[in-house]
Amino acid sequence: MTGTQAQSSDNAQQPDGLIIAAETRRMIWNAVAVDGDRVFVAGPRWAGVNGPAIALIDGKDGLIPYPDASWNAWQPGSDVTKTFVNVNAIRRDDHNGLWVIDTGSPTFGGDPLPGAAKAVRIDLATNRIGRIYPLGPRVALPGSYVDDIRFHGDHAYLTDAGRAGLIVLDLRSGEARRVLDGAPSVTAPTGRPIVMDGEIVRMPDGSPLRVNSDPLEVSPDGRYLYFGSLHGPWSRIETRLLDDPGISASELASNVEAWADLPPVGGTAMAPDGTLYFTDLANEALKKRAPDGTITTVVQYPGLHWVDAPALAGGFIWLPVPQLDRLPLFHKGTSKVVWPIRLYRYKLDAQAN
């Protein structure tokens, strides 16, 4: 990985403490996970680049397909159950596992291919697939975009950014359930647009981009799941209610509470003390929300343009910068991406992780 200090294309001075950890012209990195000295990155197929779905950065600038080449070799018409069709998130758990969230849809806004949507756990000690959790047609619906994952005990929680809702996954049985389908707490509001470079991000038909349930975190004590659409605001609900399949949909909905009125965010990470780090898209900034609700700016820099899915590891917060709004999809087929794509890291206070 390169430690080169550099300036972005707008010549703004890079802030002290912000380090370029790696860069590439092959992938659009929207996710990162760290295991000791190993750094993993991932990016969605619909971004239109030619790198692997998941890569291990080899310490120079190379990208090694992970866990192997075959899992990264999906082509239209090939097996979707043992390959990555479209990776949207990777996440390291507390038991030496790397989780991969495959939306199952190779196109943005498309339907998951039959049998393709899944959560895959890789054993980091052996670099082999430990278990595959299929997200069947009752969970990954037409229009679903399974987005990200968090854990508590024997359960995992996933967001669906396409068909608004949450997914509860029993890690022992493998059974998955949809909850809060179409609820206001998981649905993108119409009055909070995503603004980047001073303009509303729009779909090819000209309508504002709306992303349903996307960011989520579990409180350090495991009591609450915090969640919301990408646009905000955030809500919370007790995990014990989510974990109980006997709780009715109406009772579950009645127990959703307002939590934090955050702006549109690219991604979040929660520290052990309950501090929520989030990337403020419009302001190209990393901010933090203290447990008492106070919000402060950690670092602001034009190079942090649409930071997605940060990760806390080794005393740093790792910040992939995919520049998603600059992809051709959102600009009538013309790319506005400023190459190279970069992964930054920023040193945090000792208590952060």
Give the label of every model feature segment.
Residues 106-155, 159:
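Asp-box/WD-like beta-propeller blade repeats and closely related beta-sheet repeat scaffolds
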Residues 41-48, 100-104, 111, 158-162, ...:
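Conserved beta-strand positions in repeat-built beta-propeller and related beta-rich domains
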Residues 25-36, 78-97, 101, 138-157, ...:
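Beta-rich, blade/repeat-based domains predominating
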Residues 63-73, 130-134, 177-192, 244-260, ...:
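Beta-propeller fold detector
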Residues 19-52:
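Beta-strand-rich domains and repeat architectures in extracellular enzymes and scaffolds
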Residues 172-176, 237-248, 348-352:
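Short loop/turn segments immediately following beta-strands, especially the blade-tip
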Residues 60-99, 103-107, 112, 131-139:
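Blade-loop segments of beta-propeller domains
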